[in-house]
């Protein structure tokens, strides 16, 4: 799975500021669901975002608010994001964003 080059740069900067991400990048996380490929952390098969990632809002906006998405409801927005990304509180963030 690939991501936009600008998003990738931002993701790597965010990883460098997050203790868990730094540990995952050097192989110190024992949970077998996490893996690193080309400096990107994956949880299962989704790109892992840190707790304070600024990419969350960009992803929510791109998935729910873009003209091509037609303001999908919660379920479609959640599923679309969950296919590619993983972060703690994803479901709650999607619910909040869809309600706004």
Residue ranges and their predicted role:
Residues 59-62, 76-80:
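A general alpha-helix detector
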Residues 77-100:
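Amphipathic alpha-helical
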Residues 1-68:
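Flexible, low-complexity interdomain linkers flanking nucleic-acid-processing modules
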């Amino acid at each position: 799975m690939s991501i936009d080059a600008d998003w990738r740069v931002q993701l790597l900067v965010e990883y460098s500021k997050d203790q868990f991400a730094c540990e995952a990048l050097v192989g110190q996380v024992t949970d077998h669901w996490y893996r690193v490929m080309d400096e990107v952390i994956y949880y299962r098969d989704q790109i892992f975002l840190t707790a304070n990632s600024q990419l969350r809002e960009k992803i929510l906006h791109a998935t729910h608010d873009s003209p091509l998405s037609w303001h999908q409801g919660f379920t479609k927005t959640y599923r679309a994001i969950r296919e590619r990304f993983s972060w703690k509180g994803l479901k709650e963030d999607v619910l909040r964003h869809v309600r706004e």
